[in-house]
Regions:
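Structural and coupling elements of P-loop NTPases
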Residues: 1-718
Length: 718
């Protein structure tokens, strides 16, 4: 197998809603390039993609699969991505290293919610797409309706390059209006017969050819002038115009296929080779310094790691794209994150689980290596002489949160390690032990996402665990000024303890004026003026301002750190529910000492109890985390979705309709979002999706606070 240069490589990403035939199309592409001599199928569990046991069980893609094929003396790297939005992290990784998306549509369904979701990701990641109406051999295939739905919903203008002569189970021919030929397929082996367009189809073909010509001319002034001058464009001119339109992400060429029968696959691959942007024409990668990294084969090597995997008997497999230069077996690179050197002992091209040894990979190519030390997804490997770091993948925020509980006592530590290892392969999984909540919290893209992870862990590691409702990281604060004093006094034998602290607390807010001539609540005309100030950004959010207004030596300065420590300890376990307290100003204005018995522990305990008493008298409030939620839903289901959100104490921030879908924005308490993905799927027959991002902390309603206080009291009594 030859080493391919950047001009001989195309990197494509297969995207589309679940069930659009991406894996079957990838299989047909590998067959056409003779990487395999027989096409596998989903039903028989022998495709290059979907090659894991769990994918065989579910009969769907769960992980992205990297494969390649050789065609027209070019190398086509293919990344087959899952259609389910629960596994969208794979698409973000794939589009980081892929230059163009091949966007599949089910000929029976056309544009679906899954299509809308993946189109949004393609727009977000600024990738051009080629449209493929697949499964035209299905019983209810309707090419015209599918294209019309694409036209109605897509922000990128579709243009027909091919249309079927017949469709449904009899589908075996299409007309290519770029080449102005008809192609007919007799067997399911990809062999085609090129024919002239039948007379009864000629008018339609010519009309669509004219639309294609006009679309190509729109994207280039020279082509537009040529079109006005000659009234048409050559095939090469059309390709040139489509190249420009694709690069601008303004046009989506539409093709006809049946991946299952290998109809139209070869022609699609020809178009990708001839028209789709490759490493030299696609936008350059950016470094973390904002500099462009061109695909220059002569420059010092740079490779970007977009996928990490652990395989039994092999260990860690690192998938990367060579961004610049070339990498050969034995090349020594530096991991720019860790500073450690990594030696690439072996190089492979990838075809699913099959790995083909390479001696060298050049700029623009994709491959893998094994047994690197501490390299993971989003790392850059670079020549030590020019250690540039590639801008990392920004993965989507988690949308599902649960607590983890091992079924067998004693499995907690092992389970924690296994869950943390899962993050190595899937960066959209977040796992942490919350000291605050005393739970192991796992976050992912949806309930299905985490259930798949659990199934895999149970089978591979023989560990069983449950997902349970996670506790909510509430916060406590105050709403008014309060004063308290507390004397800690203890006598034990010869040694005693004595410390008395008087304090004022009030709510803190950004930009509030400094305290001057501070009137002490409940102390008549008593006024204090703070002398010193300390300000702390709290690890859990918010601030603490700590002032000393001590005069006349009532409390030695050496005891002030102990007083601060006592306050911080109580803020670490708030007086109401044990949640963190935040956004408070404390002024220590008086106190008493004993010449013998006063010590740090005495003042710490006095401050702790004075703070607790003052807090309870300062209009204490519980605050809850609020999330911005965006729901994308077909218009027919909007009423049910909105009603459900309002039952979750949501505040509707806005709605807008967009090409058959409604986008609803709301702020929702985190406490109301547990298992929301499951409810949303049930309400909309699986046709909606949502995203969520932390917004702020807000006070809970009075009835909710009463319930939380009662629950905490009941737990405390137990």
């Amino acid at each position: 197998m030859k080493n391919y240069s950047a001009k001989e490589i195309k990197n494509i990403v297969l995207i589309g809603a679940p069930g659009t035939g991406k894996t079957t199309l990838a299989e047909a592409m590998a067959f056409e390039g003779k990487v395999i001599d027989r096409r596998g199928s989903i039903e028989t569990n022998n495709t290059l993609s979907d090659n894991t046991d769990i994918e065989h069980e579910y009969k769907r893609s769960i992980y992205s699969t990297i494969l390649f094929t050789e065609f027209m003396d070019r190398k086509l790297n293919i990344i087959d991505c899952p259609g389910s939005d629960d596994f969208c992290g794979s698409l973000f990784s794939a589009f980081k290293v892929g230059d163009v998306g091949v966007f599949l549509f089910n000929a029976q369904n056309g544009w679906e919610v899954g299509s809308e979701i993946q189109a949004r990701y393609a727009r977000l990641l600024q990738k051009p797409v080629i449209g493929v109406v697949n499964q035209l051999d299905a019983d209810k295939a309707n090419f015209e309706a599918a294209v019309e739905s694409i036209r109605a919903s897509s922000r990128v203008k579709p243009v027909i390059v091919q249309y079927p002569v017949n469709q449904g189970p009899e589908f075996n021919a299409f007309i290519d209006v770029l080449l102005m030929k008809m192609y007919r397929f007799k067997d399911n082996d990809g062999h085609r017969e090129e024919l002239e367009i039948p007379a009864e189809e000629l008018d339609k073909a010519q009309e669509l050819n004219k639309e294609l010509v006009e679309m190509a001319a729109e994207h280039d002034e020279a082509l537009m002038e040529l079109y006005f001058d000659k009234g048409t464009l050559t095939q090469d001119d059309i390709r040139a115009g489509l190249k420009i339109g694709l690069s601008k992400r303004e046009v989506m060429p539409i093709f006809c296929t049946s991946g299952k029968r290998d109809i139209g696959i070869k022609r699609l691959m020809e178009f990708i080779i001839n028209v789709a942007p490759g490493p030299l024409k696609a936008p350059n990668f950016l470094s973390t310094d904002g500099e462009e990294i061109a695909a220059d084969e002569t420059a010092p090597a740079v490779a970007f790691v977009f996928k990490s995997q652990v395989e039994q008997h092999i260990g860690e497999i690192t998938y990367f794209r060579v961004i610049r230069g070339r990498i050969a077996e034995g090349t020594e690179l530096v991991n720019t994150r860790t500073g450690n050197k990594e030696k690439v002992s072996q190089l492979f091209a990838v075809a699913g689980r099959n790995r083909i040894k390479f001696t060298e990979l050049m700029a623009g190519d994709i491959g893998c290596t094994v047994k690197l030390k501490g390299t993971r997804t989003n790392d850059t490997l670079a020549a030590p002489s020019a250690p540039v770091t590639v801008e990392p993948i920004v993965f989507p925020e988690p949308r599902y949160r649960a607590a983890v509980k091992a079924k067998e006592q004693g499995d907690e530590e092992k389970l924690g390690k296994v869950l943390n290892d899962a993050k190595f392969e899937d960066p959209t999984i977040l796992v942490e032990y919350s000291k605050e909540l005393k739970q192991t919290i796992i976050q992912g893209q949806g309930e299905h996402h985490l259930n798949i992870l659990r199934t895999r862990i149970e089978k591979e590691n023989r560990l069983q665990y449950d997902y349970i409702a996670p506790k909510i990281p509430y916060r406590e604060t105050i709403t008014k000024v309060a004063q308290a004093d507390y004397r800690h006094k203890k006598q034990s034998g010869c040694a005693g303890q004595f410390g008395e602290v008087h304090m004022i607390i009030e709510p803190y807010y950004e930009g509030m004026p400094e305290p001057k001539n501070y009137k002490v609540p409940g102390k008549g005309d008593m006024v204090v003026n703070p002398k010193t100030k300390e300000e702390y950004d709290l690890p859990w959010g918010g601030k603490l301002q700590f002032y000393s207004a001590i005069v006349g030596g009532a409390i030695d300065a050496r005891f002030m750190p102990a007083i601060l420590k006592g306050i911080m300890e109580k803020m670490d376990e708030g007086p109401l529910t044990g949640s963190y307290a935040r956004d408070i100003r404390v002024v220590i204005y008086d106190g008493k000492m004993h010449p013998v018995d006063s010590n740090e522990i005495s003042f710490k305990l006095a401050a702790r109890n004075a703070f607790k008493e003052a807090f309870r008298n300062a209009g204490p409030k519980i605050m809850e985390p609020i999330y911005n939620v965006e729901v994308l839903v077909p218009s027919d289901y909007m009423g049910a979705v909105m009603s459900d959100l309002q039952n979750r104490r949501a505040m509707i921030a806005g709605m807008e309709s967009d090409k058959g879908f409604d986008r609803l924005n709301a702020t929702v308490p985190l406490a109301e979002l547990y298992r929301y993905s499951t409810t949303l799927s049930s309400l909309t027959s699986g046709s909606a999706t949502y995203s969520m991002k932390f917004s702020s902390y807000e006070q809970v309603p009075a009835d909710v606070q009463d319930k939380l206080l009662k629950a905490y009291t009941d737990t405390d009594e137990e």
